[in-house]
Amino acid sequence: MNRPHQYFTIYDYRAAIKSLDNFIGEFVGSKFREEALYYKFLASYEIAINSVQSKKYQRLMDLKQLHNNIVRYYPETLFEEDLSKKIKTVEKEINTFAN
């Protein structure tokens, strides 16, 4: 879990996501899976929010799906407060595309 965290701290979100995907796939039953999904959400959030308009909507929708997966697998996640704040921002951004 160190490498994905290092990528995240140096703002290399794409590398962090790739590394986290590898970790999640290789260590399915890991006690760090919840944290890995959370960091994947954070990295995806940064990419989606700062995306160009042509890619933003799809990235926001993917992020919403990732949030739903986290909440489904970890209904009492330790990161619920932060996830709730960020998903509200995501939903506001998605709504701007509806208008």
Question: Where are the regions that the model predicts?
Answer:
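Acidic, polar-rich low-complexity tracts and alpha-helical solenoid repeat scaffolds
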Residues: M1-N99
